Amino acid sequence: MAATAGATPSSHLLLSSSRHVAASPQPRILFPSLSGKRVAVGKNHHATGVRCMAVAADATAETKPAAKKKSGYELQTLTSWLLRQEMKGEIDTELTIVMSSIAMACKQIASLVQRAGISNLTGVQGAVNIQGEDQKKLDVVSNEVFSNCLRSSGRTGIIASEEEDVPVAVEESYSGNYVVVFDPLDGSSNIDAAVSTGSIFGIYSPNDECLPDSDDTSALGSEEERCIVNVCQPGNNLLAAGYCMYSSSVIFVLTLGKGVFAFTLDPMYGEFVLTQENIEIPKAGKIYSFNEGNYQMWDENLKKYIDDLKDPGPSGKPYSARYIGSLVGDFHRTLLYGGIYGYPRDAKSKNGKLRLLYECAPMSFIVEQAGGKGSDGHHRVLDIQPTEIHQRVPLYIGSKEEVEKLEKYLA
């Protein structure tokens, strides 16, 4: 087919022609990399023209996959994160379900806390718990929410709560039988003032010893005793632990024994979204968190420690004091900024005030996973064997260097 007179020079390159392309005033180089090189003429190349042919890629050339660009709108929820841990073999399906039920309980409690004044959930309930403490209305409701979520999971065998006298065997359990200990609402005395509060939990390995047995004719006291024995485990046995802080935002902090992760509740989607990975507490910090209103009832060695923190020393900068009155709130700040939180024994509380099983042990498990330390002043908290459900111990927790410094004063 002959080219028309009006054909442009470039049109010669688009046609399979036997004519010479030399007719083009200024031949264009299609492949600059081949410019100046001799190209062998084979059956697909003709001296009188050019045919458009596909060129096979060089088999020796390495093709690198394009880097995946992370979208600014990509969110990883707590649920998807747990499923990934399950796929990696870090946890099993049963534990994933238990964790999801705890997250659901925390969402419900967060809503109750935010609407406490509107829903008339402030003030005391009129009852006293096993510790002799006045129960707030939200204490009772939060305990019910937590317990119901764990029961409905079908994967929990025993639950032990600050608000319950003894551990409770969950009859509805289908499989899993995990032991879950929790404080449904820590810092509830702050509710009326809308100050930070939180929930604390710990999860231990499955255990069947406390489940109801239709063939067991023993007295209820014997069954309760078996429950207590199986729940009273040292913190070293924890599989997972965490807390949820109800503050300006709702933050769910979790460890499965390999790092500490934080998830923030997105009110738009109603989901906990991963916001911090592998949190590490600073090795030291210039913040201390103690209730100094009890100073006169403390041990002399502890008084000396606090006095030295206030001394500017050669640096000219004393430690800063920060105290909220909520274990979760004070601990979360310490985890991020470093320093030390302490609730010591005193003349009024000979054994301390915080509970070992569902407050001190879970928090110590978290802080150690972040590189910190939890101590009763002399021993590692996770090594202490509980002798009763509501056992109290002194607690000093935070940056490793700060806790070890305090232990030297108390030695």
UniProtKB/Swiss-Prot annotation:
Enzyme class name: hydrolase
Residues of the transit peptide: 1-53
Pathway: Carbohydrate biosynthesis; Calvin cycle
GO biological process: reductive pentose-phosphate cycle
TM spans (from-to): none
Induction of the gene: Light activation through pH changes, Mg(2+) levels and also by light-modulated reduction of essential disulfide groups via the ferredoxin-thioredoxin f system.
Binding site for substrate: 186-189, 291, 323, 341, 343, 353
Pfam families listed in its UniProt record: FBPase (PF00316), FBPase_C (PF18913)
Cofactor note: Binds 3 Mg(2+) ions per subunit.
Gene Ontology CC annotation, any one: chloroplast stroma
Keywords recorded for this protein, A-Z: Calvin cycle, Carbohydrate metabolism, Chloroplast, Disulfide bond, Hydrolase, Magnesium, Metal-binding, Plastid, Transit peptide
Annotated catalysed reactions: beta-D-fructose 1,6-bisphosphate + H2O = beta-D-fructose 6-phosphate + phosphate
Needed cofactors: Mg(2+)
Chief location of this protein within or outside the cell: plastid
Disulfide linkage: 227-232
Localization annotation: Plastid, Chloroplast stroma
Quaternary state and interactors: Homotetramer.
Miscellaneous note of the record: In plants there are two FBPase isozymes: one in the cytosol and the other in the chloroplast.
Protein name per UniProt: Fructose-1,6-bisphosphatase, chloroplastic
Gene that specifies this protein: FBP
